[in-house]
A protein has these predicted regions:
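Short active-site oxyanion
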Residues: 2-3, 58-61, 80-82
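C-terminal binding/interaction regions
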Residues: 4-6, 10-13, 89-142
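Conserved beta-strand termini and adjacent loop/short-helix elements that scaffold enzyme active sites
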Residues: 6, 34-36, 86
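Short, solvent-exposed amphipathic alpha-helices that sit
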Residues: 13-24
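Short glycine-/acidic-enriched loop or helix-start segments at secondary-structure transitions
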Residues: 15-16, 72-74, 115-116
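A short beta-strand-loop structural module common to alpha/beta enzyme folds
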Residues: 29-41
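Short, structured active-site "lid" loops
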Residues: 46-67
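Mid-chain, well-packed structural core segment of small domains
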Residues: 63-109
Length: 142
């Protein structure tokens, strides 16, 4: 699986820490960083769009910004993207099981690195349940 990851300045430090952790935790996943390149102030939408535009059926994304609202809103403008703003492991689980989320949006100012790692682990290891949820997910794209 390929993973695209991106953040704005508020999520930069957590993004870098998650990349280092994921290389060890998920060695078979190919990680491509779509930016930002530093903690210098930048526009979240640029990096949310870069991740969303890169997605396909065999990939997932992770986006980080201060609240994760901006990156989620921007990413969800793209057809086929289901970016889920998560702040607990349980919400990340439900986002995968019920919504087939393909982007995990993390509010870097409101969760610890340990919570972010738990959500990422769940995001990769939790399958979509399908069934009654599949017909609901099919209704998302206009």
């Amino acid at each position: 699986m390929k993973l695209y990851i991106g953040s704005d300045h508020a999520g930069f430090e957590m993004k870098e820490a998650l990349k280092d952790w994921m290389v060890k935790e998920f060695p078979s996943i190919q990680i491509q960083d779509k930016g930002c390149p530093s903690a210098e102030s930048c526009d979240y939408a640029d990096y949310a769009h870069a991740v969303a535009e890169s997605l396909n059926n065999d990939s997932r994304g992770i986006l980080l910004c201060g609240s994760a609202n901006g990156v989620s809103i921007a990413a969800n403008k793209h057809a086929g993207v289901r970016a889920a703003l998560c702040w607990t492991e349980e919400i990340a689980t439900l986002a995968r099981q019920h919504n087939d989320a393909n982007i995990l949006s993390i509010p870097a100012r409101f969760v610890t690195l340990q919570v972010a790692e738990a959500m990422v682990r769940t995001f990769f290891n939790t399958p979509f349940e399908g069934g009654r949820h599949a017909k609901r997910v099919e209704k998302i794209d206009l």
